[in-house]
């Protein structure tokens, strides 16, 4: 088979869409597309009807080119010379690039001088997890400058000033808070939190006082009994006017009061009761 027949056989192969089991392929040109040489995965097996035609093409194809690729052309064809000139460079791109470790060094041989600094503050470790920084497999270390929020210890002088301020104002204003912070050598946040906690404590104490002041029975206190017994057959206790100091005792006062047996404020009236029994009404 001469070069002309081989060229027409290759052209017929690219024109037939069933050879690659794809859609219609455009006309074959002298410069084949570069994607034919960039594929890394092996192509699917050829259909049985083209096995005989491809067998003749495999004899003249180089070992590095797949049977589906363009067969070699004659040396006098300029397209074939151009194809063989660019073939080694295109096949060299299919190899993977060298690894990131130069000079054949292993990944375990490299040691990180400093561990990766975490960009976000919430990703840093706290003092509660500081033991993880000593673990050999830990991905982070506990930073010494990282301070965990601790409980503020107020002095007696500071507590005295704060209690005095709370006695007058349950809610402190911003200017007064700044003034107290400068005077007591505290921050505004410390004073704000102290007043919040103190208000909660004060509310709990007030609720406890209200609950303890109300009796369990739910009723109010009993009223004192009045010393007044009004019966139909008894005499009423009358309170006569007090005698003038150093004066004579009025004639209506009984002898028991004169002798001091009864208190001078209370006495039995000698006159009979003015309350008369009710008479039943006669039917009309």
From Swiss-Prot:
Q: Name one Pfam family in it.
A: Homeodomain
Q: Which GO terms describe its biological process?
A: animal organ regeneration; cell population proliferation; digestive tract development; endocrine pancreas development; enteroendocrine cell differentiation; epithelial cell proliferation; exocrine pancreas development; glucose homeostasis
Q: Please describe the organ and tissue distribution of this protein's expression.
A: Duodenum and pancreas (Langerhans islet beta cells and small subsets of endocrine non-beta-cells, at low levels in acinar cells).
- Give a Gene Ontology cellular component term annotated to this protein: cytosol
Q: Where is this motif: Nuclear localization signal?
A: 198-204
Mutagenesis or variant effect for residue 269 to A? Reduced phosphorylation by HIPK2
Ranges of Pro residues composition bias in the record? 240-253
Q: Where in the cell is it found?
A: Nucleus; Cytoplasm, Cytosol
Region described as Transactivation domain: 13-73
Map motif Antp-type hexapeptide onto the chain: 119-124
PTM comment: Phosphorylated by the SAPK2 pathway at high intracellular glucose concentration. Phosphorylated by HIPK2 on Ser-269 upon glucose accumulation. This phosphorylation mediates subnuclear localization shifting. Phosphorylation by PASK may lead to translocation into the cytosol.
Keywords associated with the record: Activator, Cytoplasm, Developmental protein, Diabetes mellitus, DNA-binding, Homeobox, Nucleus, Phosphoprotein, Transcription, Transcription regulation
Q: Specify residue ranges for compositional bias: Polar residues.
A: 50-59
Instruction: Name the DNA-binding segment ranges.
Output: 147-206
Write down the superkingdom of origin. Answer: Eukaryota
| Entry's Gene Ontology molecular function annotations | chromatin binding; DNA-binding transcription activator activity, RNA polymerase II-specific; DNA-binding transcription factor activity; promoter-specific chromatin binding; protein-containing complex binding; RNA polymerase II cis-regulatory region sequence-specific DNA binding; sequence-specific DNA binding
Q: Where is this region: Disordered?
A: 30-116, 202-284
Primary localization: nucleus
Question: Which family does the similarity line name?
Answer: Belongs to the Antp homeobox family. IPF1/XlHbox-8 subfamily.
Task: Please give the name of this protein.
Answer: Pancreas/duodenum homeobox protein 1
Protein species of origin? Mus musculus (Mouse)
């Amino acid at each position: 088979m001469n070069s002309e027949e081989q060229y027409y056989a290759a052209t017929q192969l690219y024109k037939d869409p069933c050879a690659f089991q794809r859609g219609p392929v455009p006309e074959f040109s002298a410069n084949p597309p570069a994607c034919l040489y960039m594929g890394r995965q092996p192509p699917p097996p050829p259909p049985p009807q083209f096995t005989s035609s491809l067998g003749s093409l495999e004899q003249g194809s180089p070992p590095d080119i797949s049977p589906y690729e363009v067969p070699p052309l004659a040396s006098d064809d300029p397209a074939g010379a151009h194809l063989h000139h660019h073939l080694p460079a295109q096949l060299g791109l299919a190899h993977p690039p060298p690894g990131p470790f130069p000079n054949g060094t292993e990944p375990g041989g490299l040691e990180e001088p400093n561990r990766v600094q975490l960009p976000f503050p919430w990703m840093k470790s706290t003092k509660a997890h500081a033991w993880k920084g000593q673990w050999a497999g830990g991905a982070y270390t506990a930073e010494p400058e990282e301070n965990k929020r601790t409980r503020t210890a107020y002095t007696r002088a500071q507590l005295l000033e704060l209690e005095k301020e709370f006695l007058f104002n349950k809610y402190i204003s911003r200017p007064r808070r700044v003034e107290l912070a400068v005077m007591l050598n505290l921050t505004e946040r410390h004073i704000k939190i102290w007043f919040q906690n103190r208000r909660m404590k004060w509310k709990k104490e007030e609720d406890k006082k209200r609950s303890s002041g109300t009796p369990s029975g739910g009723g109010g206190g009993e009223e004192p009994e009045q010393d007044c017994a009004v019966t139909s057959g008894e005499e009423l206790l009358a309170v006569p006017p007090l005698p003038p100091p150093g004066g004579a005792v009025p004639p209506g006062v009984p002898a028991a009061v004169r002798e001091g047996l009864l208190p001078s404020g209370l006495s039995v009236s000698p006159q009979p009761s003015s309350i008369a029994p009710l008479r039943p009404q006669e039917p009309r």
